[in-house]
């Protein structure tokens, strides 16, 4: 190693070639990093610049035109005298370092000349590889001391062969290989400052070592185990600052040129005792060379460069030799918190260039390169550049360099690339490089296949587009006008682009659109295909309405539209709460079951408004055609999709609320069973891919909320009923109907009658009378009709009382209406003047025109008009009462019992009457006759009741042989109404026992429950409706099965008010409730008339008549 004092002897003045070297350097000094991963290249002269750059630059340092060495470190060989001087001074310097610095392991290098203010300096101990020619890439002109003035030879500074201590920079992702540039980014400001000072001092040498962790990102080596111990000795050819993407701070980008392999022997991390113990005064003791300014030649390429620090030749005049201690080149780095390392050079193991294995591996690498180059143009450029840099022209002569090149251009794993760098055995290195290159070959094959597939698709589309453009041009030249088909095709394309069609649907759409483009508009198939595409593009694929999961808003909306219906409202609120927690909701299938007029259909619309969904309703009552649900086949003329697809088209969303009304009245015919078609539609597990016969593509209905309505569940097929969540809506009681009438029905009817703001009062007692005497059903539909009738009658009376003068017909018409009336009268007068008899068709058209609505002015009612409708004058508006009372008997005779029934109209009181058809004699025979339009179940109930009543009499009243001789007739009034259901058992039994015991029943007791032969009372349904009917009939007690106790407890208090509920388990309990004061001795006496006694009475009567 040469000390600074010896520099003038080695670097002689080369003034004769100063201008030529300076001119050459100016064209190559501006170095720019290549924005790509991996190895990076710098700007080259135009004649040596490749046509394309790859992600891994293969630019090696270029020597002179006639240079025969590969990666040669000099432009011109040194003289024998200079070479001997170098060796002598190196030996002297080594001895001085060993004696004076026993603790320090780092050696000193040549002192650099001072850097000028613009960041450019001539290198004394080394040169910049990026700014000149040759492997070192730069040239420097030392001082003229020690060289004769007449010596004009120019010697290029040599890269130090021994540089024991350098600053270490960790590298991420992939290692550096000797001879191949790489750009790195320094984010640590301390490291960036150290690099800047190194460049200014002319010591731009660092050690680059690969991180073991791929995700590591640091500019300082904290621990020796964090990096691999084999790296490269690299020269910083240029460096320039860059702003970060976030605009905060700045980083330094440096271009490194690796020269040789080195091994890390010792790490001196920042802040270590060894680094702190070194006296910083050594740096200050170093003599500062004074630069001799030289005129600089600036060309266009240099002006465009953005290099902050580069290396050019410059003349340096050193100061006189000082008497201080020898200069240490890296001592100035001790003040920076950077990592320093002691390194040793690694040399390749000797090998036989003629080895058959090496030659075979070399040939294989060359063959793989050829194959990769044929598939990847970037590799082709890299190989071309590598070949140009090899002046020998024979890759066999440099197998080690070929292995490094193979690893440098391959995108292998960091560990695999590090193994190539760490291998000093050439044969082993080539094997590992071949493995990495083979993997790159596989990647290139896959990339080539993908590229070909993409190109084929693009080429096909481009060809189709080119042909279509040609066809349009031919039509335009021939003057053939477009038939509108092209516009239609473009319209369908635009509509489809706005939709998120599934892949299967998109394929069908493309096929049909292609078919449409090739069909003639006059063809019948053209209209079929056009209609199909129109439906396909009107389905809201991927479009959903924003749902409202606000609980308070839902409560407000539901309460505004409906009174009561607590169960339904709670279920909807549960649905909204689940959607709020999950962020989304799936489609559900709800079925509202209840009597007519309770709000089943209208509640569906309120639910849609509360959820913010679109609403669609269709009825399936009496539906017999499956095509109404699943659509028609396209082969039929006038084919249409099913009602569900029509609902999606109308609502324009995938998540509407669809109300299927009257699902219990669906029919069945020769065209199929619609209820079976609904199985797929209303199954959450299947409707995600609902297949309509017309569309013939799967449609997702899983987001649709289906709501069905029915009066009864008996007629709904069981598989279909199982798919729905049934919510029962019971009938309204009198109090609820009163509230509904006051809050909803009366204001609506008043507004519809044109009496809004007019003092027309419908009193509370009038509404009660309507409920009691006119509208006894469980719903409010008839009540609504009666209230509307009341307000219509009121409007008629008001208009009649005010008279025609309040608003004459001439003043009622607006200007528009008057013009229409004048036109009509003019036409009539013209027809009359012509005397032509108008035809029936003309008369019809004239009448139609006359009946056309004409704009009119609304009549204003004076404020003094007051109308009051109360209980007394109610019949003047709605007529006489329809019902007098539910109670047929104020006092029931023996054999008459009040039962309770549950029908589609709600609950009703049902009497059971039993009479004795003839006198009880010893000769009479027992019999039972049943009337009242009873169906099978009630007939069986009557038979069971008759048998059980006979058993009770035989057991408890054996002497009363009533059923042995009695001819009994049992009747249920209102025979025009069919009656069926298992809930009249105890009522019939009680009626028969009342007749047998000749004891009347309390008329304020009603009962319901089915009976077994052993006397067990079974559970029934519709207890709420039946309780409402009992209350309406004025009952005070309701007897019901004990199994229905939970239903009784759920009844609102206003329903149970004034009624005592008595649950029973056995009929014996019913008997004790019905006959609490029965005289058992009297009841146990026989009521049969003996035959001899009757004969004596008859003969005596006959004799009396004869006398």
UniProtKB/Swiss-Prot annotation:
Domain Lon proteolytic: 891-1077
One Pfam family this sequence matches: Lon_lid
Composition bias type Low complexity, residue spans: 832-845
EC class name: hydrolase
Sequence segments annotated as region (Disordered): 32-152, 273-329, 808-858, 1085-1107
InterPro entries linked: AAA+_ATPase, ATPase_AAA_core, Lon_bac/euk-typ, Lon_lid, Lon_proteolytic, Lon_Prtase, Lon_prtase_N, Lon_prtase_N_sf
GO cellular component, one term: mitochondrial matrix
Biased composition (Basic and acidic residues): 80-101, 142-152, 815-831, 846-856
Binding annotation for ATP: 594-601
Predominant localisation class: mitochondrion
Presence of the UniProt keyword Protease in the record: yes
Catalytic reaction(s) noted: Hydrolysis of proteins in presence of ATP
Stretches with biased composition (Gly residues): 122-141
Positions of the Lon N-terminal domain: 166-441
CDD domains given in the database record: RecA-like_Lon (cd19500)
Oligomeric form and interacting partners: Homohexamer or homoheptamer. Organized in a ring with a central cavity.
Entry similarity comment: Belongs to the peptidase S16 family.
Known role: ATP-dependent serine protease that mediates the selective degradation of misfolded, unassembled or oxidatively damaged polypeptides as well as certain short-lived regulatory proteins in the mitochondrial matrix. May also have a chaperone function in the assembly of inner membrane protein complexes. Participates in the regulation of mitochondrial gene expression and in the maintenance of the integrity of the mitochondrial genome. Binds to mitochondrial DNA in a site-specific manner.
Protein name per the record: Lon protease homolog, mitochondrial
Upper classification of the organism: Eukaryota, Fungi, Dikarya, Ascomycota, Pezizomycotina
């Amino acid at each position: 190693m040469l000390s600074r004092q010896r520099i003038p002897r080695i670097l002689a003045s080369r003034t004769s070639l100063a201008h030529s070297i300076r001119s050459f350097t100016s064209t190559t000094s501006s170095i720019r990093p290549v924005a790509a991963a991996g190895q990076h290249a710098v700007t080259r002269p135009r004649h040596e610049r490749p046509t394309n750059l790859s992600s891994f630059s293969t630019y090696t340092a270029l020597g002179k035109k006639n240079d025969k060495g590969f990666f040669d470190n000099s432009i011109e060989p040194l003289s024998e005298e200079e070479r001997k001087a170098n060796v002598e001074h190196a030996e002297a310097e080594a001895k001085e370092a060993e004696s004076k610095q026993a603790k320090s392991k780092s050696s000193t290098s040549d002192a650099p000349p001072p850097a000028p203010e613009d960041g450019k300096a001539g290198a004394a101990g080394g040169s910049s590889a990026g700014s000149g020619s040759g492997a070192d890439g730069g040239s420097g002109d030392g001082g003229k001391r020690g060289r004769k003035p007449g010596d004009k030879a120019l010697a290029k500074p040599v890269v130090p062969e021994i540089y024991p201590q350098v600053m270490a920079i960790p590298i991420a992702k992939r290692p550096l290989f000797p001879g191949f540039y790489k750009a790195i980014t320094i984010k640590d400001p301390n490291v960036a400052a150290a690099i800047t000072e190194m460049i200014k001092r002319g010591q731009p040498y660092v050690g680059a070592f690969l991180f073991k962790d791929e995700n590591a990102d640091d500019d300082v080596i904290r621990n020796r185990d964090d990096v691999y111990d084999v790296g490269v000795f690299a020269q910083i050819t240029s460096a320039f600052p860059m702003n970060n993407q976030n605009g905060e701070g700045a980083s330094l980008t440096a271009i490194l040129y690796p020269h040789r392999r080195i091994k890390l022997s010792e790490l001196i991390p920042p802040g270590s005792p060894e680094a702190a113990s070194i006296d910083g005064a050594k740096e200050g003791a170093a003599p500062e060379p004074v630069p001799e300014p030289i005129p600089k030649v600036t060309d266009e390429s240099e002006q465009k460069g953005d290099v902050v620090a580069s290396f050019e030749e410059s003349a340096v005049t050193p100061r006189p030799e000082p008497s201080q201690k020898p200069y240490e080149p890296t001592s100035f780095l001790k003040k920076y918190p950077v990592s320093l390392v002691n390194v040793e050079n690694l040399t390749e193991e000797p090998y036989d260039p003629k080895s058959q294995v090496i030659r075979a591996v070399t040939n294989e690498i060359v063959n793989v390169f050829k194959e990769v180059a044929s598939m990847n143009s970037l590799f082709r450029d890299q190989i071309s550049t590598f070949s140009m840099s090899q002046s020998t022209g024979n890759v066999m002569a440099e197998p080690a360099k070929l292995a490094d090149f193979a690893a440098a251009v391959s995108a292998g794993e960091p560990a695999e690339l590090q193994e190539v760098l760490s291998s000093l055995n050439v044969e082993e290195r080539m094997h590992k490089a071949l493995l990495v290159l083979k993997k790159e070959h596989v990647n290139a094959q896959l990339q080539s296949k993908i590229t070909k597939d993409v190109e084929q698709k693009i080429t096909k589309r481009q060809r189709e587009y080119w042909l279509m453009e040609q066809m349009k041009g031919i039509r335009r030249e021939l003057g053939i006008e477009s038939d509108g088909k092209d516009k239609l095709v473009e319209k369908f394309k635009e509509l489809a682009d706005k939709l998120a069609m599934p892949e299967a649907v998109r394929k069908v759409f493309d096929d049909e659109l292609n078919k449409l483009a090739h069909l003639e508009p006059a063809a019948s198939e053209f209209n079929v295909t056009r209609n199909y595409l129109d439906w396909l593009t009107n389905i809201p694929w991927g479009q959903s309405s924003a749902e409202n999961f606000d609980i308070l808003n839902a409560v407000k909306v539901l309460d505004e539209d409906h009174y009561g219906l607590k169960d339904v409202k709670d279920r909807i609120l549960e649905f909204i709460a689940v959607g709020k927690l999950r962020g989304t909701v799936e489609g559900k299938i709800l079925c509202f079951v209840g009597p007519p007029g309770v709000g089943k259909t209208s509640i569906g619309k309120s639910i849609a408004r509360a959820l913010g969904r679109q609403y669609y309703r269709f009825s399936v009552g009496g539906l017999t055609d499956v095509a109404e649900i699943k659509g028609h086949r396209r082969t039929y003329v006038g084919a249409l999709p099913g009602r569900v697809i029509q609902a999606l088209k109308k609502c324009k969303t995938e998540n509407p609320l669809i109300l299927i009304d009257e699902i219990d009245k669906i029919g069945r015919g020769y065209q199929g069973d619609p209820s079976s078609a609904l199985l797929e539609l209303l199954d959450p597990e299947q409707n995600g891919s609902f297949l309509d016969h017309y569309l013939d593509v799967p449609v997702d209905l899983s987001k649709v909320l289906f709501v069905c309505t029915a009066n009864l569940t008996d007629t709904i097929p069981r598989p279909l009923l199982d798919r729905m969540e049934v919510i029962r809506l019971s009938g309204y009681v009198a109090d609820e109907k009163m509230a509904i009438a006051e809050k909803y029905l009366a204001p609506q009817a008043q507004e519809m009658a044109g009496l809004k703001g007019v003092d027309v009062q419908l009193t509370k007692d009038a509404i009660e009378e309507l409920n009691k005497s006119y509208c006894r059903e469980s719903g409010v539909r008839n009540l609504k009709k009666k209230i509307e009738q009341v307000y219509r009658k009121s409007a008629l009376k008001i208009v009649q009382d005010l008279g025609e003068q309040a608003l004459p017909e001439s003043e009622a018409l607006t200007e528009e209406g008057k013009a229409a009336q004048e036109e009509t009268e003019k036409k009539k007068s013209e027809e009359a003047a012509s005397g032509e008899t108008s035809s029936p068709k003309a008369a019809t058209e004239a009448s139609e025109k006359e009946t056309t609505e004409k704009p009119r002015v609304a009549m204003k009612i004076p404020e003094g008009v007051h109308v009051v409708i109360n209980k007394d004058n109610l019949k003047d508006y709605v007529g006489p009462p329809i019902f007098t009372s539910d109670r047929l008997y104020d006092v029931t005779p023996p054999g008459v019992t009040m039962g309770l029934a549950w029908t589609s109209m709600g609950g009703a009181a049902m009497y059971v009457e039993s009479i004795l058809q003839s006198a009880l004699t010893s000769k009479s025979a027992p019999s039972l006759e049943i009337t009242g339009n009873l169906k099978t179940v009630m007939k069986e109930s009557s038979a069971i009741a008759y048998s059980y009543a006979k058993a009770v009499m035989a057991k408890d009243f054996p002497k009363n042989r009533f059923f042995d001789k009695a001819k009994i007739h049992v009747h249920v009034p209102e025979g025009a109404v069919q009656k069926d259901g298992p809930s009249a058992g105890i009522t019939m039994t009680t009626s028969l026992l009342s007749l047998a015991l000749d004891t009347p029943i309390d008329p304020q007791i009603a009962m319901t429950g089915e009976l077994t032969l052993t006397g067990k009372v079974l559970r029934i349904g519709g207890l709420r409706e039946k309780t409402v009917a009992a209350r309406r009939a004025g009952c005070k007690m309701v007897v019901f099965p004990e199994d229905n106790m939970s239903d009784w407890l759920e009844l609102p208090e206003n329903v149970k008010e004034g009624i005592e509920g008595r649950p029973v388990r056995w009929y014996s309990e019913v008997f004790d409730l019905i006959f609490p004061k029965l005289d058992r001795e009297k009841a146990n006496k026989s009521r049969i008339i003996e035959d001899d006694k009757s004969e004596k009475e008859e003969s005596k009567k006959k004799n009396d008549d004869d006398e």
